[in-house]
A protein has these predicted regions:
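Charged helix-capping and loop-helix junction motifs
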Residues: 67-68, 100-103, 142-144, 216-222
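Conserved phosphate-binding/catalytic loop of the ribokinase/pfkB sugar-kinase fold
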Residues: 126-152
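His/Asp/Glu-enriched, well-ordered alpha-helical/loop segment
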Residues: 223-233, 251-263, 269-347, 351-354
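Active-site core of metal-dependent hydrolases
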Residues: 146, 150-271
């Protein structure tokens, strides 16, 4: 196999794995006789990392707040090359949010393969940019919410909020506690978002979606995202959420080194389901899109391997760049790039094997194959 190590395409190399970590990448002909060898065909790359996954395998995190539910979601996405993800819990009651965090605490303690932490998307968002989120559950952030958001002692916690609704002090407190804070479902103006970035805002959830568009005299959240160098942007590259031209413009403005592919996947990923229920509303799966009856997008019918293929085929990006957007760049955003996102000595053996059409042949998490 060719090896993409996170920076370069390498030929004629072996990847040596011991105790779930990468030991080295020696020339294949230099392998000692005592090493158990497996020959694989295709392209071996760092496993994909997806920071926005609402569900998969028929399970929606909001509905199934259990370790087994989390395990099902992770397993469904693993089939598409995702070796690390943040199961994502969207706007809901305080009680169910606490249950989701507790289930994640248990899943992390149980070392469920592929689970890196939790993404809490809402409920501290803008009602006017709610998208498919239930307005009945949108609310201001209180002290008891901060306790839930900072409850996890291991793994990553990512919170998507509207900075104009929460204020800068809450963002600074979350960031100081190690929580990753993203702006999303926001109607905040440019100045508010830039100031939030100075107070610890780390990124932007599904850039362009659920936020005002960039305008000449009012750049808004999109302008702030593209004009703040040390922030990261999640991109849904499915041909439905954002036009290909708008994605290319964003990458031309900010570069790809702070752009990460996300799926925003729902329960249908990895299944042949034609729809599902979300807070009592039916979501329909048609022509690669998930929508309510009135046509509102409700997450995406996307997996990471498809996002990689779309980025190469639709956006015309080079494969090394795209593979970084699917692995190393999200690892950096999560502050896990010391052990994820590269095939290098000391890194976790989280790997994906792709065929020539960029479909997934096999994955490894901590050196264990699926």
């Amino acid at each position: 196999a060719r090896v993409f190590d996170g920076a370069h395409m390498l030929d004629g190399r072996a990847v040596v794995i011991e105790n779930g970590r990468i030991l080295g990448l020696p020339p294949a002909q230099d392998l000692g006789a005592g090493i158990e060898q497996r020959r694989v065909e295709g392209l071996l790359a760092p496993g994909f990392i997806d920071v926005q996954v609402n569900g998969g395998g028929g399970v929606l995190y909001n509905d199934v707040r259990t370790v087994e539910g989390i395990r099902t979601i992770a397993a469904a996405h693993r089939a598409f090359g995702t070796t690390g993800l943040l199961p994502t819990f969207i706007t809901d009651t305080r009680e169910t949010m606490a249950e989701a965090v507790d289930a994640m605490r248990q899943a992390l303690a149980a070392r469920v393969p592929g689970v890196l932490g939790i993404h809490l998307e809402g409920p501290f968002i803008s009602p006017e940019r709610k998208g498919v989120h239930n307005p009945a559950f949108i609310r201001p952030m209180k002290e008891e919410d901060l306790a839930i958001l900072t409850a996890l002692s291991e793994g990553c916690t990512l919170v998507t909020l509207a900075p104009e609704r929460t204020g800068l002090a809450a963002i600074a407190r979350l960031a100081a506690a190690g929580v990753l804070v993203c702006a999303g479902h926001t109607a905040g103006d440019y100045a508010t978002i830039v100031e939030a970035a100075r107070h610890g805002l780390r990124g932007f959830t599904h850039l362009y979606n659920a936020m005002p568009p960039l305008a000449g005299r009012d750049p808004g959240p999109v302008g702030a995202a593209l004009d703040t160098p040390d922030t990261w942007c999640g991109l849904i590259v499915d041909g439905h959420h954002v036009s290909d031209a708008a994605l290319r413009v964003a990458m031309a403005a900010k570069g790809t080194e702070h752009m990460m592919l996300v799926t925003d996947a729902m329960a249908v990923t990895g299944t042949d389901l034609t729809g599902f229920e979300l807070h009592g509303r039916t979501i329909y799966r048609r022509d690669g899109r998930l929508t309510t009856a009135d046509g509102t997008l409700a997450g995406s019918d996307l997996d990471m391997a498809s996002a990689v293929r779309n980025s190469v085929q639709r956006l015309g990006l080079g494969l090394p760049e795209v593979l970084r957007m699917a692995s190393l760049i999200p690892a950096r955003f999560l502050r896990l790039d010391h052990e994820l996102g590269r095939i290098a000595p000391g890194y976790r053996a989280d790997l994906v094997l792709l065929d020539e059409s960029l479909h997934v042949r096999q994955t490894w998490i901590g050196g264990s194959s699926n």
